[in-house]
Amino acid sequence: MTFAGFGEHAVEFYDGLMADNSKPYWDDNLAVYRADVRAPMEALLAELAPEFGPGFAEGKVFRPHRDVRFAADKSPYKTHCGAVIEQGRGGGAYYVELSSAGLRAGGGCFHLASDQLARFRQAVDTDIHGKALEKILASLRKTGWEIKGDALKTKPRGFAEDHPRLDLLRYRSVYAVRSWEPDDTLHERACLDRVRKAWRQVRAFNEWAHDRVGPSENPRR
């Protein structure tokens, strides 16, 4: 299937799900989800995978159901559809998401396991690799990206208070994101070019994460 844009009811579907996150709503609108959201997302990922997947990772579209086993919010469905090409969480990721808010693209270290966090901080602590990451993130900010993540309020153990990259060392996850509100492009093939351009911009960040962090070697629970 060739990507031709998300369906005309894609945003409307998520507007409705935000208002009524229930199985009856889902069942009544399942055909819309499949045709206007899921199928186009799979087609989008299939067209991007040949450029961004080889030597990096496999791609997948996330399942729509939430894991509510330990969540206070028992809403059964995610209010977005996300897809990713990643080599195990934390070691770099190309991410795209559709929701009622529009389109979002991202990249970087969304989740860092303990061994990945140790390698991340070791790389940041090293002048050559730490300065390289600073330069990458500064360039992304200049081109409209937001740098986000979970960070400690204090310094991590083992590092000096005056470390030149203390702000980076505080991160327990760090990634770049940019968003587009719903517009005509979302429903056109030009949406593919929008995501491709964004992923190319974040490629240096992902390559840094691929080379310096890599996949977790911790046993899977």
Predicted regions: what they are:
Residues 10, 15-65:
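Active-site acidic/histidine clusters and adjacent loop/turn architecture
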Residues 95-97, 165-166:
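Short, surface-exposed charged micro-motifs
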Residues 37, 66-68, 85-89, 100, ...:
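Short, flexible loop/turn elements at secondary-structure junctions
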Residues 52-93:
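Hydrophobic/aromatic-rich structural module bridging two neighboring secondary-structure elements via a short loop
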Residues 1-16, 40, 52, 143-221:
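Long, solvent-exposed, polar/charged low-complexity segments
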Residues 101-159:
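Compact, glycine/acidic-enriched structural inserts
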Residues 49-67, 120-123, 127-135:
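Short, intrinsically disordered, low-complexity segments enriched in Ser/Thr and Pro
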Residues 81, 92-94, 103-105, 172:
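Generic beta-strand structural signal
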